[in-house]
């Protein structure tokens, strides 16, 4: 599954979202003064703690708020085994989502630009509905920009239940069992 991380820059400060340690980290850290590492999904440990310690910045795991930042934290999912926060950046009209929405075949079934996570399709969480981003930054798959970003969110919700059989059919054999 294609994984992505994001470096969000505002006022010379950089917030690293669900980062992966690799060559890209040097480029991300060079964008400005590191302000924090944000882990938006409880199980997206990735390299968050290591990177935060190395940079000497806070590691905020599934935060309810991001103090000193331009982001609004959204409680995307709050279930016993799934805690996820999304970020809304009003000034940039950017929505950052770790797992609820993604742009990879496991989420989309190959039919949608953006799709809902398989396990959430029967009862989609309503927390992200209504946001009309111009930039949709995702934890899996390529980000979506422009009018497709907002319509991608709405389409993912509108087709969540209806396309569930199609998504299940498209899962790789190793996942189906």
Provide a role label for each language-model segment:
Residues 1-36:
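Pre-active-site segment of Zn-dependent metallo-hydrolases
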Residues 2, 23-25, 43-47, 66-67, ...:
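Active-site environment of divalent metal-dependent phosphoester hydrolases
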Residues 11, 34, 54, 131-132:
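Structured helix-beta-strand junction loops
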Residues 13-16, 79-177:
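Metallo-beta-lactamase
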Residues 1-3, 71, 82-84:
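Short beta-strand-initiation
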Residues 68-77:
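Short Pro/Gly-enriched beta-strand edge/turn motifs at strand-loop
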Residues 9, 51-53, 79:
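A generic structural signal for short, solvent-exposed coil/turn residues
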Residues 22-68:
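Active-site metal-binding motif and surrounding structural segment of the metallo-beta-lactamase
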């Amino acid at each position: 599954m294609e994984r992505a991380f994001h470096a969000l820059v505002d006022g010379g400060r950089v917030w690293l979202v669900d980062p992966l340690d690799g060559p890209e980290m040097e480029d991300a850290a060079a964008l400005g003064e590191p302000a924090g590492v944000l882990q938006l999904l409880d199980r997206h440990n990735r390299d968050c703690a290591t990177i935060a310690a190395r940079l000497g910045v806070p590691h905020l795991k599934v935060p309810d708020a991001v103090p000193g930042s331009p982001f609004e934290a959204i409680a995307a999912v709050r279930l016993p085994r799934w805690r996820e926060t999304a970020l809304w950046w009003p000034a940039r009209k950017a929505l950052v989502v770790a797992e609820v929405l993604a742009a990879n075949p496991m989420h989309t079934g190959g039919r949608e630009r953006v799709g809902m996570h398989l396990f959430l399709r029967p009862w989609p969480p309503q927390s992200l509905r209504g946001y009309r981003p111009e930039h949709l930054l995702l934890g899996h798959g390529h980000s979506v920009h422009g009018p497709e970003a907002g319509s991608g969110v709405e389409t993912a919700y509108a087709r969540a239940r209806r396309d569930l059989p199609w998504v299940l059919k498209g899962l790789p054999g190793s996942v189906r069992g």
